[in-house]
Amino acid sequence: MGRVWLAIVLCGVGPLVSATDLSLSSDRVEAVHSARLTFEQIGSVVLKSSSAEYSSGLRLLPAAGESGFDLSSGRYLAADLESLASHQQRVCLQVRDSSRDTYAGIALDPGEKTTIKLHLPHDFIYASPEGAKGVKTLDTRNITDIAFLVVWPYEGQFSGLLNVRISNIRLAGPPDHARKVALANYLPFVDPYGQYLHGEWKYKVRTDADLRGDLARERGELKPAPEAWDEYGGWANGPQLEATGHFRTEKVNGKWWFVTPTGHLFYSLGINVVKTDSDAPNGYMHRDWYVSPPQTAMSFPTWNLRKKFGKTDFAEDYYDFVLDRLDSWGINTIGNWSDGALTKLGRKPYMLAFDLSGVDLPKLSGGFYDTLDATFADKLKASVQAAAQVAGSAQAQAVTDPMCIGFFIGNELSFPTDSAYYEPFFKACKEALAAVAPSKLYLGSRFKSLRNSEALWTAAAKWCDVISVNSYVASVAVFTDGQYAAPKFDRPVLHSEFHFGTLHRGMFSAGLCPVGDQCERARNYKRIVAGALRHPYFVGSHWFQYRDQPLVGRGDGENYQIGFVDVCDRPYPALCRAAREVGEMMYNVRAGK
């Protein structure tokens, strides 16, 4: 992989603060499930486990006679880690009070030494009135246990799965008391730009002039696409393979790749949900939440972009700007759920979906499709054909567009335990797509996890050109190692969704993979893509999503700080720089140079 991937700016944790006893003494540390602990004289503990199941790991308990840890005097809980494994591994730090928990994750390369930190959501700082949106808090004065483990396990069982030295657990940095708001003064909490009203941060927008000034400033900072790329974002100086005029896949030197229409190797580095807007909650609900209550469904990003570009019909100008942004960030693919107006510009490779929601297909009682019903395949084919023939739609153009890599059909489906339904589903999807877009790749149905039965992997591998998986973990490097549910197939895999978030810029939730701060978001981005690049199956890594979710939540309540840009279209610089570094180096890295 080379040393460059380890040359990451260390993320600071702030000064050490006095705290409750957090020493790793043998009388207060217990192994969980299959974990094994070795206590060292220097005060550290080596944690080893061959399994990620059942919270396998290390648990630190309060001292005898105490009900919990008092972590109220620090902004972060931090610990030093050293990887003793021969593979990239992931570790999570978790804290729990009497009823709730939170965690932060990190990936470690072999031999790497670093610090993991968890942003403590103090209830005495982040409390919000009942019924109003806010941070999920913990009683940090009485934390019942601290644990090091692997959350959302997908890994197969193998010796040395987890092998890490843990030391110097500590509190760092003072709590952010300035964030505290008296409950009586909390409402309203959303400012006219969709930001958290009561917080202060470097990139906060305060006037319309701030938005107008952003455009010229950022345009002056944008860079061209990496020099190593061809016109598709493929490896211009790599091997020349057969050019077919459309994207395809090929295994080269033991690793799967996409191949561009001109015959160059291509690793898909993408971002999902690239749009002008975001999910728009109903503005007429909870009007007391807003400084400027909207009358209907509101989209603060849309309103902010109108001010930024000085007109209501800004979309064309904005998407030209976005495409320049993606080049500058080292992103070569427009991911799923993005605006068709953007993909139809034909300037960057993209992936689209045929949506099955609302399609009249026979179903089982559990919600999955009755793929054994005699009408299923024909109905599915008809729905795909109808969608592909809608005049002016992104799908209609994409079926013959060289920039279109392929199509997903379905998303995070709940497959039944009966494997008899698997192959008929994938077969019907493959044949339906082949009937309308024979030159396009069938990209699967975006599994909701890397953990699936061997029967499901096998059925997908038989019919999918690429198997897509949404997996919110810090590393995918050991996905095919071990014996438990290890997929036995040889087919390219797309990591179709992942992200890292933190409590920053006033946001209330860090998403499905919380980390300590923006520096950690960037670091984890580089680590997870590096692990995928080393793996022979992965052909792409797609971040979810382009923009932070609404502060008050989308329709299902998600309000994650997970974007490359915030609600005011201001980028997160550390994450953008990390993506650029990956985009510049990924071809040499995947080729083992």
Predicted features, each with a name:
Residues 35-59:
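Short carbohydrate-recognition loop motifs
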Residues 149-157:
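Short beta-strand-plus-loop segments that form exposed binding edges in beta-rich domains
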